[in-house]
Amino acid sequence: VPQQVYILSRDQIERANAQTAADLLTTDGLLTVQKSQQGGGSPMIRGFESSRVLLVMDNVKMNNLIYRAGHLQNIITVDPSILERVEVLYGPSSVSYGSDALGGVVAFRSKNPVLGDGGKTLFSGNAFMRYGSAN
């Protein structure tokens, strides 16, 4: 079944320098995020609220229609700095993802971990900085 898919690559995610996954997804207008407390939000695709939009992290469902209808705040729990890519599938994806994906799917893929090779000590890190002003 053909459908519209938008993919955010690792480079696009890093260049966006978003503070939350909600900010990341609204930067390019991929979907609407209904803002709530602490910068979180409920994703909305084509008028479907978050209970009808499936959120998936590494092929594991983050929300489930059984638990609650209405606004869900699961999108704030994803840190953009751990993401390798994000796929936004618009429209019904019930065939591939089940009945929870009536409005669409937001599929997050995390980066692969860096593992040591035996006796060597492995140390790495990264940093990013942002500046903001109210004026």
Question: What are the residue ranges of the model-derived segments?
Answer:
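Gram-negative outer-membrane beta-barrel proteins
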Residues: 65, 133-135
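Acidic, small-polar-rich N-terminal luminal/periplasmic segments of exported/outer-membrane proteins
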Residues: 1-120
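Transmembrane beta-barrel strands of outer-membrane/channel proteins
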Residues: 127-133
